[in-house]
């Protein structure tokens, strides 16, 4: 058994801007497990800075090498792994990178695709697009291009002071599209009056307007809005999802497997959303074709009832590290049919983008 890593620096096709910064590259750790003729892959959704959450590439590598990889070497099944690493507080993205590595391994060991190993897939994922902040005219052009390609939901990034202009322009030009907005926790409880102005734009939901770890203020804001709230950063466990619905803090949850600690916790959150008759979708973190394959598989599950941020690979990368990138047809993407996550790695581009590599365990 061997666990290795590649740290990659992959240039994005265009800069991606949110309320907390602009990405021009995707800096990512890709992990590989080799055992008994099976090769499994995963990646970490962190980057170089702890701006989305508290983890970054440096913390993930430390936690994986010192604590998680030794557990993975025992080849526990994913649920067993989650139980065995409970003693480690937080560090969900590190945990997810190893849990999902085990999911790929065991799906392949059982000669099943990941979706068949998990179960309850409808066979396709409905696709939405997330657009970073940009010049208004550029954004309008990107929206038209996305609609022409068949995307089923448009999401625009906003921040305090730059929300009314973009939302007004989008609604003036596209009055009937399925539209959402994501603030990435840029507002505070002092901004309720400003946020309430967003109601006029008929959004399907407003995503994470307040603090990244908050439920209480979101529950208060929800009472003032007709627009449903979607929580992203705040939902780091099934327990927090339960509390959020009980307190009325949201009607929608954006699931990111990395943020929740892996597929197991993500499935639990789906069950909670279903119990409360809410809505749920699969988000994205500018993943490579490896992480994107996990996302598409999850987004195809029958309990997912909103389009997710599961764009084809060419949305972000000119050349991905997989030879079989996803393509979209009529606003849907089908999971890979091969065993596990079903990706074929391009050794050419893996080598081209690698800035560091080595053995972890």
Predicted segment positions?
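Flexible C-terminal active-site loop/helix
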Residues: 1-12, 23, 28, 36, ...
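Metal- or metallocofactor-binding catalytic centers and their adjacent structured scaffolds
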Residues: 5, 34, 39-109
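Short, P/G- and charge-enriched loop/turn segments at secondary-structure junctions
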Residues: 15-20
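Conserved, mostly hydrophobic/aromatic
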Residues: 31, 37, 98, 111, ...
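Hydrophobic faces of well-ordered beta-strands that scaffold small-molecule active sites
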Residues: 42, 125-131, 152-156, 179-183, ...
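Predominant activation on well-ordered alpha-helical scaffold segments within soluble catalytic domains
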Residues: 65-69, 99-104, 168-171, 196, ...
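Metal-dependent enolase-superfamily TIM-barrel catalytic cores that perform enediolate-based chemistry
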Residues: 116-225
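Shared catalytic-loop signature of beta/alpha-barrel
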Residues: 213-230, 235-332
């Amino acid at each position: 058994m061997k666990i290795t890593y590649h740290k990659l620096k992959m240039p994005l096709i265009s800069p991606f801007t949110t309320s907390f910064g602009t990405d021009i590259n995707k800096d990512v750790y890709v992990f590989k497990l080799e055992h008994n003729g099976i090769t499994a892959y995963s990646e970490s959704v962190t980057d170089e800075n702890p701006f989305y959450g508290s983890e970054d590439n440096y913390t993930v590598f430390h936690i994986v090498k010192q604590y998680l990889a030794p557990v993975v070497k025992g080849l526990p099944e994913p649920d067993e792994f989650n139980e065995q690493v409970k003693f480690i507080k937080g560090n969900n993205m590190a945990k997810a990178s190893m849990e999902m590595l085990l999911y790929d391994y065991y799906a392949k060991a059982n000669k099943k695709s990941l979706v068949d190993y998990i179960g309850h897939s409808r066979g396709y994922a409905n696709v939405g697009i997330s657009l970073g902040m940009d010049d208004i005219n550029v954004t309008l052009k990107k929206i038209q291009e996305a609609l022409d390609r068949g995307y089923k939901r448009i999401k625009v990034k906003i921040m305090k002071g730059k929300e009314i202009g973009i939302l007004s322009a989008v609604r003036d030009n596209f009055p009937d599209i399925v539209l959402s907005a994501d603030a990435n926790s840029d507002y505070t409880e002092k901004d309720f009056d400003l946020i309430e102005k967003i109601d006029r734009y008929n959004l399907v939901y407003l995503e994470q307007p307040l603090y990244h770890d908050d439920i209480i203020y979101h529950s208060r804001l929800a009472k003032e809005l007709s627009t449903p709230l979607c929580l992203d950063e705040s939902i780091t466990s099934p327990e927090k999802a339960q509390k959020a619905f009980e307190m009325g803090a949201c009607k929608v949850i954006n699931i990111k497997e990395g943020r929740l600690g892996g597929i197991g916790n993500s499935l639990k959150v789906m069950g909670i959303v279903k119990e409360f008759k809410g809505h749920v979708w699969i988000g994205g973190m500018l993943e490579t074709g490896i992480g994107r394959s996990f996302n598409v598989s999850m987004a195809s599950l029958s309990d997912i009832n909103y389009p997710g941020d599961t764009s084809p690979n060419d949305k972000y990368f000119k050349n991905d590290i997989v030879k079989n990138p996803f393509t979209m047809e009529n606003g849907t993407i089908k999971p890979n049919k091969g065993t596990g996550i079903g990706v074929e790695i391009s050794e050419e581009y893996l080598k081209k983008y690698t800035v560091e590599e080595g053995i972890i365990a």
